[in-house]
From Swiss-Prot:
Gene3D superfamilies with a match to the protein in the record: NusB-like
Name the UniProt record assigns to this protein: Transcription antitermination protein NusB
Reported function: Involved in transcription antitermination. Required for transcription of ribosomal RNA (rRNA) genes. Binds specifically to the boxA antiterminator sequence of the ribosomal RNA (rrn) operons.
Keyword Lipid metabolism tagged: no
Family to which the UniProt record says this protein belongs: Belongs to the NusB family.
Gene from which the chain derives: nusB
Gene Ontology molecular functions: RNA binding
Keywords: RNA-binding, Transcription, Transcription antitermination, Transcription regulation
Organism: Myxococcus xanthus (strain DK1622)
Any one of the GO BP annotations: transcription antitermination
Stored InterPro entries: NusB-like_sf, NusB_fam, NusB_RsmB_TIM44
Disulphide bridges, residue numbers: none
Entry GO terms, CC: cytosol
Classification via NCBIfam families: nusB (TIGR01951)
UniProt keyword Transcription, yes or no: yes
Length: 140
């Protein structure tokens, strides 16, 4: 698995933990890495990318959540599963604040996170919502 995919997975786990318990970003990331099988061989690029994602989502969370609310049809943020909500946050952060990551990559990676961590409807839900957000943001 590549460094960025690993970083995204750890970022998702850390964001999930930050919603569940009082923890700092560093504590949540450490917990995510410790729980992972490959914790003995942490790729420095994956660690850095995960930290950038979590810190970015946390600092832009209000804006990101507004985009989720605006583009989710008949779903309130608080009714979404924690996994779906945080996958969407990661995807939107990449779409809006990481111009170095192509739209297709951001959406596909978020869909994969939905498949791997969410329920059977997560990937389609994530794909549809992120596509609407990308169009609204004029992300090529």
């Amino acid at each position: 698995m590549g460094a960025r995919r690993t970083g995204r997975e750890r970022a998702l786990q850390a964001l999930y933990q930050l919603e569940m318990a009082t923890a700092t970003t560093a504590e949540a990331l450490e917990s995510a890495w410790s729980a992972a099988e490959e914790s003995n061989k942490r790729d420095p690029d994956a660690v850095k990318f995960a930290r950038e994602l979590v810190e970015g989502v946390q600092s832009h969370r209000d804006e990101i959540d507004q985009l989720i609310e605006r583009h989710s049809h008949n779903w309130r943020l608080d009714r979404m599963s924690r996994i779906d909500r945080n996958v969407l946050r990661l995807g939107i952060f990449e779409l809006k604040y990481r111009p170095d990551i192509p739209r297709k990559v951001s959406i596909n990676e978020a869909v994969e996170l939905g498949k791997n961590f969410g329920n059977e409807e997560s990937s389609a839900f994530v794909n549809g919502l992120l596509d609407r957000v990308a169009v609204a943001l004029n992300k090529p």
